[in-house]
Curated annotation (Swiss-Prot):
InterPro entries: KdpA (IPR004623)
PANTHER family: POTASSIUM-TRANSPORTING ATPASE A CHAIN, POTASSIUM-TRANSPORTING ATPASE POTASSIUM-BINDING SUBUNIT
Alphabetized Pfam families for the sequence: KdpA
Keyword Plastid: no
Protein's name according to its UniProt entry: Potassium-transporting ATPase potassium-binding subunit
Subunit structure: The system is composed of three essential subunits: KdpA, KdpB and KdpC.
UniProt keyword Ribosomal protein, yes or no: no
Species, as recorded: Bordetella avium (strain 197N)
Gene Ontology molecular function: P-type potassium transmembrane transporter activity; potassium ion binding
Key words, A-Z: Cell inner membrane, Cell membrane, Ion transport, Membrane, Potassium, Potassium transport, Transmembrane, Transmembrane helix, Transport
Record membrane topology: Multi-pass membrane protein
Protein role: Part of the high-affinity ATP-driven potassium transport (or Kdp) system, which catalyzes the hydrolysis of ATP coupled with the electrogenic transport of potassium into the cytoplasm. This subunit binds the periplasmic potassium ions and delivers the ions to the membrane domain of KdpB through an intramembrane tunnel.
Family membership: Belongs to the KdpA family.
Length: 594
């Protein structure tokens, strides 16, 4: 780890861990305290929304009712996003005159944004109108994040309550998460990004004259559109000179802010946060990285406060941070060094592997952003992940395959890590012959079934989907690179979709009916099967009586528990993928060696 990256990592984590406790305390009170002074400004609006929608905020739900509400809400969101894409050619705020999105791409995109994945198989600036970007995609960036946070609060209430049949009210949780947490933070971040040069307008695309003309050769075509040949049978060409460029415009900052805070990741432009209109400066890059992890880190403190012991949240956060630092080190070391092939040629490796990276960020900031965005289930990128070295790409891929629990998504990261915590405690209890318990709740057979479903759904989707994609002609047709790297592209795509990340190895041609359907189904089931299992677990825990702490109870706040949790995540989460990783990035790395 070089000194520049080490300094950047320490500075970044210091700011993150200083801010997280304050935000965590605010989130708890904003979500649970109806008399919190800091949210008094929006209470009238909250009550109005309940009245207009016919919601009784005092009526709580069982876990089944909560799950049904989540699914209905998400299905309605899917329908709305799909319809807006298909009808955008007839709707306003479409200065470029973009037509309807194809049915398979609209299907994939609607699931992608509703599931908090934001996988983009299309180029946004040439596919989506301003209205679709604002009313469909940006709105779902808020709502999908609110769903994840709501499910987490239902699970935390399961730990905090005892002898109770309910886990909260989804409509209240989603409303408060959006109104009091996501909207204020997004407004503040959007203004900060605008100050750094991120654009925010609804102007038509601009055609500008470039400083230097570009020329290229193009085949001459006859009246039928076929290439013209000379007497020797060679194609005739003509030289074209271009000195203009079309610059895409749009309301970028407002979508950029919530894409990061909501850990959605879908860019307003195809280059995502590598685009200077989305991420123009070093300061904007730092703000974007902080925005990605601030809510997941803060929710660890929220969890500790709600269960009555802040040390519980700190222990979870410590495990996340240690895993994060380890994989950041792996990625940075791989990117700072040249690839094995270039090293063999004695190329100058002073700058590291700069392929696919923006010179304004360099290797250190690009590698850290890659780890941040895949530690969270964000998917925003400031470098092209397909250009990472074999070992450099292994780090981000592994972070997703761990189940997006190293910080993870808004709410989803912590409830995924809590599932691993229950599994670790259960295994430890079996090893010492004691009934496993966590936070005073006895862990029984039903609980472990739900934990197993939550943990194993995504590996099944990733491995089965990858096997299908590399076994059928439609899947193989999308692989633009042969061998191990082509396999890595498919494995990365399924890992990203099933774990609701959204980033990609862009060498895979995924905007096809086959991949749009396959990845869409992986995103849907990877999101909502896990949510239903977590809510069932929450209902089971809420109904249990709290056991008194005894000398034989396993402490869940110290170094032993942190090591146990990290070991469980690595053994259960990572070992599942060892054969697939051996065929992909590991094989690619070994093949590149002279």
């Amino acid at each position: 780890m070089d000194s520049q990256f080490f300094g950047l990592l320490v500075f970044y984590l210091a700011i993150l861990l200083i801010l997280a406790p304050f935000l965590g305390r605010y989130i708890r009170r904003a979500m649970e305290d109806e008399h919190y002074a800091a949210t008094a400004w929006g209470r009238w609006l909250e009550r109005l929304m309940y009245r207009l929608s016919g919601v009784n905020p005092a009526a709580e739900m069982t876990w089944r009712q909560y799950a049904v509400a989540v699914l209905i809400f998400s299905v309605l969101g899917f329908i709305a996003v799909y319809a807006l894409q298909r009808l955008q050619g007839f709707l306003p705020l479409n200065p470029v005159g973009l037509g309807a999105v194809s049915p398979d791409s609209a299907f994939n995109t609607a699931i992608s944004f509703v599931s908090n994945t934001n996988w983009q198989g299309y180029s946004p600036e040439s596919t989506m109108s301003y209205l679709t970007q604002m009313l469909a995609l940006t709105v779902q960036n808020f709502l999908s994040a609110a769903v994840g946070m709501s499910v987490l609060f239902a699970l935390i209430r399961g730990f905090a309550r005892h002898g109770c049949a309910t886990v909260g009210n989804f409509w209240v949780d989603a409303t408060r998460a959006t109104l009091y947490v996501l909207l204020p933070l997004a407004l503040a971040l959007a203004l900060a990004l605008v100050s750094q040069g991120v654009i925010q307008n609804t102007a038509a695309y601009q055609e500008v004259t470039t400083l230097q003309a570009q020329s290229y050769e193009q085949a001459r075509l006859d009246s039928t559109g076929q290439p013209m040949m000379d007497a020797a049978g060679k194609p005739l060409t003509e030289t074209l000179v271009i000195q203009t460029q079309t610059l895409a415009m749009g309301p970028t900052a407002s979508q950029e802010a919530i894409k990061l805070l909501g850990i959605n990741g879908g860019g307003f432009f195809n280059a995502n946060s590598a685009h200077p209109y989305e991420n123009p400066t070093g300061l904007s890059n730092l703000l974007e990285m902080l925005a990605i992890l601030i809510i997941p880190a803060a929710l660890c403190f929220t969890f500790g406060e709600m269960v009555g012991d802040r040390r519980q949240g700190v222990a979870i956060l410590a495990a996340m941070t240690l895993l994060f630092v380890g994989l950041a080190w792996l990625t940075q070391n791989a990117e700072q060094a040249l690839t094995p092939a270039l090293s063999h040629l004695s190329a100058d490796g002073l700058l590291g592997n700069m392929e696919g990276k923006e010179s304004r960020f360099g290797v250190a900031a690009s590698a850290l952003f890659a780890v941040v965005t895949t530690a969270a289930s964000c998917g925003a990128v400031n470098t092209m992940h397909d250009s990472l070295s074999a070992m450099g790409g292994l780090g981000p891929m592994l972070l997703m395959q761990l189940g997006e629990v190293v910080f993870g998504g808004v709410g989803s990261g912590l409830y995924g890590m809590l599932a691993f915590a229950l599994l670790g405690v259960f295994i430890a209890g079996l090893m010492i012959g004691r009934t496993p318990e966590y936070l005073g709740k006895k862990i029984e057979a039903f609980d472990m079934k739900m934990v197993s479903i939550a943990i194993l759904v995504t590996p099944f989707l990733v491995l089965a989907g990858t096997a299908l994609a590399v076994s059928v002609p439609q899947g193989l047709a999308g692989m633009l690179n042969p061998g191990a790297h082509g396999f890595s592209e498919v494995l990365y795509a399924l890992s990203s979709a099933a774990n609701n990340n959204g980033s990609a190895f862009a060498g895979l041609s995924s905007n096809t009916p086959f991949y749009n359907s396959l990845l869409g189904l992986a995103m849907w089931f990877g999101r909502f099967l896990v949510i239903v299992a977590i809510l069932a677990l929450a209902g089971s825990l809420a109904g249990k009586r709290r056991l008194a702490q005894s000398p034989g109870s396993m402490p869940t706040t110290g170094p032993l528990f942190i090591v146990l949790l990290i070991g469980t995540v690595l053994l259960v989460g990572a070992l599942t993928y060892v054969p697939a990783l051996a065929l992909g990035p590991v094989a690619e790395h070994l093949q590149a060696r002279p």
